[in-house]
């Protein structure tokens, strides 16, 4: 084949083959990755069996970074270079960050987005988040044993365009193909809709480490409709930690604290908050670098009193979300609790009293968002098991493909694939020094482009010049739930990219689809014979070009008789290519390949000698 398909694990076009996709909850405090196996969503753990990855990155002098639990341990010893809750900084300027004066980091107020100075250099929130995402990607690939097609990444409903784009950029840096950004409350609703088969109006109360979101959703026969959203992008479990930290400083009458001591007390505050969810009181003991010591006892009642105003701050946007949906508390059938912060008993109590119902929390609030995202990722990747009827999905009526050399069609998404879905294949260049590739998107079941429907064309330019077959161009087809096809082409070495969107069903009536299918059935034998002929003709052209290029470059390596023999074989290939006997073409190509083996060996010897020329033995 002129355009060589490089097989990529997990991205087969075979409709029966499961494509590996994951859902990622990129959280403020912790992050998770989940997938769907045997139609059941499950969280993927690390090699030690831990589901949660602390969203913490520690930069070291050698330029390396520690992520997760190893980084968590450095918060006390190296707080300035240990970045936590980076989600709060995504897409934000310095003036947008709450409590910035209490954070131990060295911020740079740069245009667009704040940056942080570390011993490993200046880092953006995008780069820091990419470290976390890359760790989750590796964790998933280790658990699943193959590469991922892509990921659905969740974001707070209140994230603006800058924050959402920053999340996409971080995923790209981490080597992830983003199938979709999904609002966290919607992901939770998907998980509960699958697990419980619930229907009606539900409020999703999502209090994470750094953000609060509330969504009012209507669930009808597995279809999710978002009626309204609300929230606060600067309110979360971290604020409860901060309030307890302030209480410790006040009660212990501490002098101004160093960054290290501040970090120690922040960890103590978080530990105390978590313990007070199950205990009536807990002790806070800390020895500070300043020589001061802290010995305090805090009760659950104290904690409720000092944080009650924060709980009230979540109820206000909840009321507004109900008003926006033109609903009252009586219209709500249930409340879904999401986020680790919702484990605090006084939060569950306040939410239950407001909605006059016991909140739903039978799915782990730390995992529910990742599980819902995994379900969505599984669908977007084109996987659908028998009985998966929780969402009304359409199918692709005709295969979507790409033109390859010789006017042939390579099918990328087969007909009857459920949508939304995404598939990718890799292709390469046909000629030496080729710097551009024309992408022709076609629709139909026939083997030749001339017999299929042309949808769109675009070009990928800026491919670095290299030998034919050396470049790797990944072409990705993605069809969303509305049937919109987006095609992107990316040269993997340079990163140059081009894309286009098209509506494949536009202007195509049902009878036309039926006729195209009938034509493909009637012409199947003829089409396959033509395809075989074209493939051999393309291969013949490729080997002729390669041989002529080799003769031009290194013809001096051959004697006159040898050169005449190669020229004769070349002529035989060119002559057979004009006919319609693909067996004859194949035989001529094989004869040329065998007849130039010695020539190829001499060229290799010359290349090796040239490469080693002038070098000493110990340099090799």
Swiss-Prot record:
GO terms for molecular function: ATP binding; ATP hydrolysis activity; ATP-dependent protein folding chaperone; unfolded protein binding. Belongs to the heat shock protein 70 family. The lineage of its organism: Bacteria, Pseudomonadati, Pseudomonadota, Betaproteobacteria, Burkholderiales. Chaperone involved in the maturation of iron-sulfur cluster-containing proteins. Has a low intrinsic ATPase activity which is markedly stimulated by HscB. It comes from Janthinobacterium sp. (strain Marseille). The keyword Transmembrane does not apply. The keyword Ion transport does not apply. Pfam families: HSP70. This is Chaperone protein HscA homolog. InterPro entries: ATPase_NBD, Heat_shock_70_CS, HSP70_C_sf, HSP70_peptide-bd_sf, Hsp_70_fam, ISC_FeS_clus_asmbl_HscA. Keywords: ATP-binding, Chaperone, Nucleotide-binding. NCBIfam families: HscA, PRK05183.1. GO terms for biological process: iron-sulfur cluster assembly.
